[in-house]
């Protein structure tokens, strides 16, 4: 399904630019080129967002693979044509084939170069952060682990370029078997009604789990707890039908994806981690 990416800049604050993204698969040349770039993190124009201060701290703590710096959206519009740079930025993404106006906030790592449209810039990684209307406190506490994942992903595809496909994240489902030795942290509000209690979960999931708070997940990430994996759920929080609900299980220490899937939200499959997702984890 082809996503549409929108990005806002100072030059176009009163309008949005629609960008029809292709399902681009980075080549071996793209991957090699990335490691020669300086990575520029695009800061948000909205002074009310905490993203800017958080991402600065995260990059200082996590980013090791390239030199990095920070730029404004206006500078991004100028520098994105230069191949000596790569960029970390957030965008608004929708999926034309889904036939819904649902929009999501994605975090991208893309290469600069002579690309007229933003969607033509080669994506090294694109991760769903949140449904676009969700407050940033729903994802900000997970930014460190997601940036850590992006960095690790670049190293993985450098070492194993053969895994790079349109659905590259499906590769991480090979890690599902390792979940049985860890404790799965989940938020109650991110569980579907069929599995929203300890008793219901135990009927379908035999491994260790805990229904926790955001603070518990943030603490596990900060401590790099090797015994914890946690659910990163991206959905419209019950406000949309036919929208996508992404469910990703991430290691608090290694930032590895242990499970990656999404479903279309219906009455039968609501916005949340489903009974079928738990069953997928024990296959």
Question: Where do the PLM segments sit?
Answer:
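Extended intrinsically disordered, low-complexity coil regions enriched in Ser, Thr, Gly, Ala
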Residues: 51-65, 195-205, 260
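Start-of-domain marker
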Residues: 22-106, 116
């Amino acid at each position: 399904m082809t996503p549409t990416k929108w990005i806002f800049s100072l030059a176009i604050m009163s309008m949005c630019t629609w960008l029809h993204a292709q399902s681009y698969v980075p080549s071996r040349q793209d991957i090699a080129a990335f490691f020669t770039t300086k990575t520029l993190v695009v800061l948000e124009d909205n002074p009310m967002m905490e993203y800017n201060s958080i991402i600065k701290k995260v990059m200082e703590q996590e980013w090791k693979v390239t030199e990095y710096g920070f730029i404004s959206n206006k500078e991004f519009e100028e520098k994105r044509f230069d191949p000596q740079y790569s960029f970390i930025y957030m965008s608004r993404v929708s999926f034309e084939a889904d036939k819904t106006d649902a929009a999501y906030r994605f975090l991208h790592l893309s290469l600069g170069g002579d690309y007229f449209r933003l969607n033509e810039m080669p994506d090294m990684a694109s991760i769903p952060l949140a449904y676009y209307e969700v407050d940033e406190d729903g994802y900000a506490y997970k930014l460190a682990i997601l940036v850590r994942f992006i960095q690790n992903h670049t190293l993985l595809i450098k070492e194993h370029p053969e895994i790079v496909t349109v659905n590259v994240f499906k590769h991480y489902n090979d890690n599902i078997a390792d979940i049985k030795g860890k404790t799965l942290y989940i938020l109650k509000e991110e569980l579907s009604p069929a599995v929203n209690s300890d008793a219901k979960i135990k009927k379908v999931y035999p491994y260790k789990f805990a229904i926790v708070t955001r603070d518990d997940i943030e603490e596990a990430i900060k401590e790099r707890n090797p015994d914890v994996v946690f659910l990163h759920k991206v959905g419209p929080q019950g406000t949309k039908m036919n929208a996508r609900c992404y469910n990703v299980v991430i290691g608090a220490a290694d930032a590895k994806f242990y499970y990656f899937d999404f479903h279309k939200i219906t009455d039968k499959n609501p916005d949340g981690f489903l009974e079928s997702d738990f069953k997928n984890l024990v296959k």
